[in-house]
Regions:
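P-loop NTP-binding core
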Residues: 1-309
Length: 309
């Protein structure tokens, strides 16, 4: 099965959706079959690859509520090797519809195996929150990539995200790893960007990608044309940054990729989507998160080592 990477940060405006779109497109540009899964009700990923959520036959919403299998929601894009499962405004109410379901945090992980076999990578754009949709994404993922803007208060709230990852590991997905921390919106003209980069590297160490995504006009313009940066202007700094990130991820995952290719049908990683041995308690990880929320707020700048990353 292809590797599932969730792009997550509950803070808005950190480059999460930009990273999801352009990482997926860059992986596709290296001829690795990639599925971009938009689980954010804002559907910016969907429009960012040239799709109108109102015009698609099915979206991730229908998948989550059990109306269609995931394979029927897949839409091809203009870019070879890149497909998408679009989002829809109806997804806003999905968490309410899912709340009474048994093992509600595992709905996405149960739906994905049939499509994971067709791809080398699945990139999930999570909502800017730590609600049920994000929990489903983390439960379904092999790893999580955390974008962090190179601006003041960059580390604010990360303790809560790391605590969520820790709880998901304990209750739902023990194999969840940190793919890496990505510095975004880096402005080479500002000393502040360098200071933030040093601070992030001090807290996260080797988990910080060597690649840094710089502020770039073309990167900001591309979504309004419904294109990833690599299709909008491949020579732009933003497109080059995300190609460098894709290469870094491919290098870090070489063993996984070779295993995936060797087994042909994608049986590598099968255990990541296996059925749990026992049903989760009724409150599940959601209850554990509520209990630990105040604790996480106090630890918002806790070093990554405390979370065994």
């Amino acid at each position: 099965m292809g590797k599932v990477i969730a792009i997550a940060n509950q803070k808005g405006g950190v480059g999460k959706t930009t990273t999801a779109i352009n990482l997926a497109a860059s992986l596709a540009a290296t001829e690795h079959s990639t599925l971009l899964l938009d689980i954010d009700p804002q559907a910016n990923c969907t429009s960012g690859v040239g799709l109108e959520s109102e015009e698609v036959d099915a979206s991730i919403y229908e998948v989550l509520i059990g109306e269609v299998p995931a394979a029927e929601a897949v839409v091809t894009t203009e870019m070879p090797f890149l497909d998408v499962i679009p989002s829809h405004i109806n997804l806003v109410g999905a968490e309410i519809e899912m709340i009474d379901e048994m093992q509600r945090e595992e709905i996405l992980s149960s739906a994905l195996p049939q499509v994971r076999r067709k791809y080398d990578f699945v990139v999930i754009d999570c909502p800017p929150s730590l609600g049920l949709l994000t929990l489903n994404s983390l439960t379904a993922a092999n790893s999580v990539l955390i974008p962090v803007q190179a601006e003041y208060f960059a580390l604010e709230g990360l303790g809560q995200l790391l605590n969520t990852i820790k709880i998901v590991r304990q209750h739902l997905n023990p194999d969840l790893e940190i793919e890496g921390v990505l510095l975004t919106m880096f402005d080479t003209r500002l000393n502040l960007s360098n200071q933030v980069a040093q601070e992030v590297r001090r807290y996260f160490g080797e988990k910080v990608f060597e690649t840094i995504v710089q502020r770039n006009v073309r990167l900001s313009e591309a979504p309004s044309f419904g294109k990833p940066a690599i299709l909008y202007e491949a020579s732009s700094k933003g497109a080059q940054n995300y190609m460098a990130l894709a290469r870094e991820i491919l290098e870090d995952n070489q063993e996984y990729i070779e295993s995936h290719e060797a087994r042909g049908d994608g049986t590598a990683g099968e255990d990541a989507s296996a059925e749990p041995d026992a049903e989760a308690p009724e409150e599940g990880v959601t209850g554990a998160l509520n209990e630990d929320a105040s604790e996480a707020e106090e630890e918002s700048t806790t070093p990554a080592d405390d979370f065994s990353l």
